[in-house]
Amino acid sequence: MYVAVKGGEKAIRAAHALQEQKRRGDGRLPELSVEQIGDQLSLAVDRVMTEGGIADRELAALALKQASGDNVEAIFLLRAYRTTLPRLAVSEPINTAEMRLERRISAVYKDIPGGQLLGPTYDYTHRLLDFTLLANGEAPSVQQANGEAEPTPHVFSLLTQQGLAKTEEDRGTPPDDITRTPPVYPCSRSSRLQQLMRGDEGYLLALAYSTQRGYGRNHPFAGEIRSGYVQVEIVPEELGFSVNIGELLLTECEMVNGFVAPQEEPPHFTRGYGLTFGMSERKAMAMALVDRALQAPDYDEEIAGPAQDEEFVLAHADNVEAAGFVSHLKLPHYVGFQAELALLKRLQRENERG
């Protein structure tokens, strides 16, 4: 048994060396730097930060490089590193209404206070391969407009002021922290949003799509999608007042959903909310759609689709947990298989005897 274990260790070390060689690729080619990944593969970095739970572009780019571009493996690496970090402070709530905008669009109103800003996007492109990139084509220069920034209140706040939507209420209870306390179903809204933010983008996208195909009552409009930089502040105990410690690039999505007519309230629109690091717009939209679907019990709506089942959605959203459980099937299961094999052969013998 000892010889078998030592042999396994040698095989594992050799496998890791081979993987490292494969990750590096052809040595005649220049190595891809972490800075290049962070700057030129920014959307992949945004996803790893969002689902890995650390807003650090350098660490996310490093994880992507180490994982050979495997997003889920990079997210796993970032989550593992996160467990080693001390918690030095808790930030004040960020104010996305004061975001320094990179992009802002609304599908419900053409003219909104502060205007719409198309910003960087793949929308409206023809999805044709750009072969000039094979020749290291340079990006076109962009002229920056110098204009005075106008206030950009949330579109949903305009609806609430007109009595068309219900204002979100802060009940004063501290938000849950799913990194310290395991979720318990049914979840609080804060716990649900945290799990959705860390959830797998593809999984949430599929569930969001299902709500549009009839598996759950959900008729949404993109009330507002905004991306930009927000200030992060903390209140040090020794000072007693807030101090700006930096800024974060975030994407926020508020979906205007079908109206409800409660008995004790006037009819009003409902909302779904999504928030991600970076420019992860598709993830923010999917998150907002699923968030609204999970509010079905709050509005006494019939559970008509998987996206409305809170425990089903949230318990299977984490790609690190999912990948870990599926991957464990690669480990030796010799004893378990031999037991089933013996049982199958016994049943076959009994069947032959009639």
Predicted regions and their residues:
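Short, amphipathic alpha-helical interaction segments embedded in low-complexity terminal/linker regions
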Residues: 1-227, 241-243, 349-354
